[in-house]
């Protein structure tokens, strides 16, 4: 039971890390969902 819990926690951690990498990766503004722009390879909200 303990092994299963550790495995599930590890799987969740890996999924979160993969999700963060996918969100941050952009080369141009069109790679980000509106209203966000690509700033230094990261999708950032555009204000103003």
Curated annotation (Swiss-Prot):
Subcellular location: Secreted
Propeptide: 22-24
Signal peptide: 1-21
UniProt feature coiled coil, ranges: none
Keywords for the protein's UniProt record, in alphabetical order: Amidation, Disulfide bond, Secreted, Signal
Residue positions where Tyrosine amide is found in the record: 47
Extra remark beyond the main annotation: Does not show effect on voltage-gated calcium channels, potassium channels, and tetrodotoxin-sensitive sodium channels. Does not show activity on Nav1.7/SCN9A, and shows very weak activity on cation channel TRPA1.
Protein name as it appears in the record: Peptide HSTX-III
